[in-house]
UniProtKB/Swiss-Prot annotation:
Family: Belongs to the UPF0145 family.
PANTHER family per record: UPF0145 PROTEIN SCO3412 (PTHR34068:SF2), UPF0145 PROTEIN YBJQ (PTHR34068)
InterPro entries listed in its UniProt record: UPF0145_dom_sf (IPR035439), UPF0145_YbjQ-like (IPR002765)
Protein name in UniProt: UPF0145 protein THA_1434
């Protein structure tokens, strides 16, 4: 499965557009880590607990998007985008979405 943020895949031709696919997850951090993160905001700098949470959420959202694409027989997902939103304090939704397509090697 090829996943790309671009419209096209070098060396391939899109032969069929199957439609939009997406994967999402709502994830939260442990209360203790949330408290530690609150103190970190006072001092400034990276809040590693939240960086890790968002990385994990993004990866899970990609996995779920790929699962959805595979279910409809896609070879690739193009124009992949991400969106995140706060659902509640300490919890965020990560959404990965793109266009599922069938591809073939081009004759270039």
């Amino acid at each position: 499965m090829i996943i790309t943020t671009t419209e096209n895949i070098h060396g391939y031709e899109i032969v069929e557009i199957l439609g939009i696919v997406m994967g999402n997850i709502v994830q939260s951090k442990h209360l203790g880590k949330d408290i530690a993160a609150a103190f970190k905001t006072l001092a400034g700098g990276e809040i590693k607990a939240y960086t890790e949470m968002m990385t994990e959420a993004r990866n899970k959202a990609i996995e779920r998007m790929i699962d959805e694409a595979e279910k409809i027989g896609a070879d690739a997902v193009v124009n992949v985008r991400f969106s995140s939103s706060s659902v509640m304090s300490g919890a965020a939704e990560m959404l990965a979405y793109g266009t599922a397509v069938k591809i073939k090697k081009s004759n270039e």
